């Protein structure tokens, strides 16, 4: 019985520390910096990432189809409790927000390797992966569970704008 209790405590403590074990700085995400472009079925996309400045990074994004904006995004990554946390908002034309004003979408950094960062929503329904493939290419992979709980994947193959 003592062994079972000890093992249970060990697994609970290990699982809790694993979830909080990633330590990273916003500076570790500097590989994302640049102006990235892509022609996609949704439209022409442009995603700008400013380099880290202090404890944060910022991004703006636009998708334009047939000369008309489809939607915008504004993103910040801020150092929060030792880990970069992404906050995202979407906007229709006219700067009409999708999310409530006090509730941006939030994604915690869950994995970081050289030139690759994975962010995940608190409800674990969305993962965003940023991977710098080479000096001119970066993939952004959106993995999202649909209403049936099945993962859907969109890959955005960006090229660095000269």
Per-region residue spans from a language model:
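Bacterial Sec-dependent N-terminal signal peptides
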Residues: 1-24
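N-terminal helix-cap/turn-to-beta initiation motif at the start of protein domains
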Residues: 21-35
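Central antiparallel beta-sheet cores of small beta-barrel/beta-sandwich binding domains
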Residues: 44-121
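Edge beta-strand at a domain terminus
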Residues: 100-101, 107-108, 137-139, 144-162
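Structural preference for beta-rich elements and adjacent junctions enriched in aromatics
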Residues: 122-124, 134
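Extended Gly/Ser/Thr-rich low-complexity repeat segments
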Residues: 129-137
């Amino acid at each position: 019985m003592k062994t079972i209790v000890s093992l249970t405590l060990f697994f609970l403590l290990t699982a809790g520390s694993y979830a909080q074990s990633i330590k990273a700085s916003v500076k570790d995400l500097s590989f994302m910096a640049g102006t990235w472009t892509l022609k996609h079925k949704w439209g022409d996309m442009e995603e700008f990432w400013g380099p880290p400045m202090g404890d944060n990074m910022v991004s703006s994004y636009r998708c334009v189809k047939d000369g008309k904006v489809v939607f915008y995004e504004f993103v910040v990554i801020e150092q929060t409790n030792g880990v970069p946390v992404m906050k995202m908002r979407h906007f229709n034309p006219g700067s009409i927000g999708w999310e409530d004003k006090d509730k941006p979408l939030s994604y915690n950094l869950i994995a970081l390797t050289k030139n690759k960062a994975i962010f995940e929503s608190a409800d674990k329904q969305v993962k965003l992966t940023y991977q710098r493939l080479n000096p001119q290419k970066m993939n952004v992979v959106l993995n999202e569970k649909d209403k049936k709980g099945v993962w859907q994947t969109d890959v955005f193959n960006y090229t660095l704008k000269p």
